[in-house]
């Protein structure tokens, strides 16, 4: 995690498929839950290569603003920027664009975790 620095950026592009959409009138459009998934995935990809063995990360907060429709079959691109590091808490600002305009923005927080402790807790819940 020592190599993570404020200002780092990472982008990811998806083609909007049926599984990413909701119905609006006669149109299938990129859904807010799918936009949230793209935000989390892009931030995760930025941070993951910088973690130490035995560390993982989990999303803990997403504040999202979905600003415009993107039809199925079109591309959406998210660009995440790491804007703050507070011990194990990572804060990202993410902008989402389609081929025409900005269609979303988000603030996303992730926590770096100890995977052994995480899996122990999970196993207890599974019985």
How should each PLM-predicted stretch be described?
Residues 1-30:
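Catalytic strand-loop segment that frames the active site of acyl-thioester-processing enzymes
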Residues 15, 97, 109-113:
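Short beta-strand edge segments in extracellular beta-sheet folds
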Residues 32-34:
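A short mixed-secondary-structure module that forms the rim of ligand-binding clefts
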Residues 45-77:
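Hydrophobic beta-strand-centered segment that forms part of the acyl-chain substrate-binding groove
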Residues 64-99:
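Hydrophobic beta-sheet segments that form the core/acyl-binding groove
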Residues 109-127:
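C-terminal output/interaction extensions
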